[in-house]
């Protein structure tokens, strides 16, 4: 495969092949704007906003102000998951009973009667004239990306017609082939090491090959070469990348760029808790992958509560994403409000989080360390 870096830099008008991962719940506009100002591509998580046009527009206007430029070198990231299945009311009810017991054991009052749908899915948008699609075409961010699957074909084509590049997260060769057949502009190859939610098209795939980032990149590049694909989408590597050496190792495959998330979490421009920050500064625990928190596999730093929740939650007993996230987020918040501390929280991070603390909370200094030899 021919090197994609120069084409990537020219297409997106950036100095470095660096994308900041969206990281819903931890990232901020300030973080995204700083990465863009420094010559990379900042990302704004939009998972909860696909039906909220005013909020999308406000976020992007505020981003422009922080960057001091209206070029909109930014990645707006949406979720394209399958909506929760109908006919699982009994599973949802048993999950609420499970949380009633957890609350009782913690000494906190439980009053939740149903699981709320925290995140709409962009997949439900099928009309290119939908207000959100029309707004995005007007706003013209450089990239609109999707996690958990592909949006509707007509929506992809409509956005691309306005010169917006469409990216999607993939975790294996089959998903890459789907993305290629859908004529996407870029694919984020998410390795098993990545923190946060696993981007599988199929939720909690029991046949997930769990390919590490290096192996996934090698697999896809080999496929591109063997299939004689002359104009592949931009290939972005993600997962476990924590320093300039790990970046250079992946760029040797001639891919376009890398996407980093966990390395930014200790920054003062991320919104992690003091307890989460301490885990970076003095790492003691491994990470774990579990679907019991949100309904989809995600990687978090392991804690006794999270291990117990995972071990006591067979996949068949877990409601569909994102329903369990409602009960989990409520518990984490209620525990803090009740003075129980952070023991019922999640601490999302990649498997190399213990290598991610750079002895600084400055985004600028972290960025400088990452690109020093690129």
Swiss-Prot record:
Keywords: Flavoprotein, FMN, Monooxygenase, Oxidoreductase. The keyword DNA damage does not apply. The active site is at residue 197. Its cofactor is FMN. One of its GO terms (molecular function) is nitronate monooxygenase activity. SUPFAM superfamilies: Inosine monophosphate dehydrogenase (IMPDH). FMN binds at residues 22-24, 238-240, 261-262. Its EC number is 1.13.12.16. Binds 1 FMN per subunit. Pfam families: NMO (PF03060). It comes from the Eukaryota. InterPro entries: Aldolase_TIM (IPR013785), NMO (IPR004136). Catalyzes the oxidation of alkyl nitronates to produce the corresponding carbonyl compounds and nitrites. Belongs to the nitronate monooxygenase family. NMO class I subfamily. PANTHER family: NITRONATE MONOOXYGENASE-RELATED. This is Nitronate monooxygenase. It comes from Cyberlindnera mrakii.
